[in-house]
Amino acid sequence: MRLSPPVAPVAIQTATRLRRQLAAGSQVDASHFWREANSLALPLVTAINDADDEREVTFLWRAASPLRGVYVRLNRVTDKDNVAKGMMTQLPTTDIWHLTLRLPASYCGSYTMVEIPPETPDETVLQLGSRFASLVGKADPLNSTPGINVRGNAQESVLALDHAPAQEEWSGCRAYAGQLFTSEHRLAGQRRRVRLYLPDVPVVQPLGLLVLTDGEIWFDHLGVSAA
């Protein structure tokens, strides 16, 4: 898995200038801003002088039409009850939306960007962090790191900061070598599929038991057996 290190020294001046423009919240030349932004690795990851174990991560979104808002749904950070933390800010009279989050330097997770159309009800916005949200997110088009397929054909972007584990077991497409057993059961009035995977190891080797909910995601889309 490719990690996202802090901005390279050669790009620090450009990154600093863009961040100052965003922090000022004033009008900018949007075309020039995007030319400079596209010369950098995005999202923009910045080291913090007094905290070696944290990073500031700046997400950007270029809107093609007027919006009520844009929401960054970052796994375990802005989802569930933390929707407000993931709401981006628009630079006045531009197509530039931005959000900066302070994250552990070891963070690794998936995220999507959700455009919120004008006239969207407050109730719909409040549900953005739940799994039943009616507005569907998209992968970040400015993030060149390969994404993952979490649900069906929906791609999500990956943010892996520089102190995150490499997790090479998730790299590439590999076939699993163990045995996968599948059975169906009726629980609480619903049919549920249960999967049991036994890795290809000697029978005398002790094994732990890992229980994963949302098995259709882990097995059907993420390929946990091969990992």
For each of these PLM feature ranges, what is it?
Residues 1-62, 169-172:
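Non-catalytic, glycine-rich low-complexity segments
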Residues 52-106, 116-178:
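Aromatic-rich carbohydrate-binding modules that target alpha-glucans
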Residues 70-72, 111, 194:
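Short beta-strand elements bearing conserved aromatic residues within extracellular beta-rich modules
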Residues 100, 112, 195-197:
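Residues within well-ordered beta-strands of beta-sheet-rich folds
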Residues 107-115, 207:
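Short beta-strand segments enriched for Tyr within beta-sheet-rich domains
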Residues 167, 173-178, 182-202:
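Peripheral/terminal regions associated with large enzymatic or DNA-binding modules
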Residues 194-198, 204-217:
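Short beta-strand element of the alpha/beta-hydrolase
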Residues 219-227:
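Short amphipathic alpha-helix adjacent to the substrate-entry channel of hydrolases
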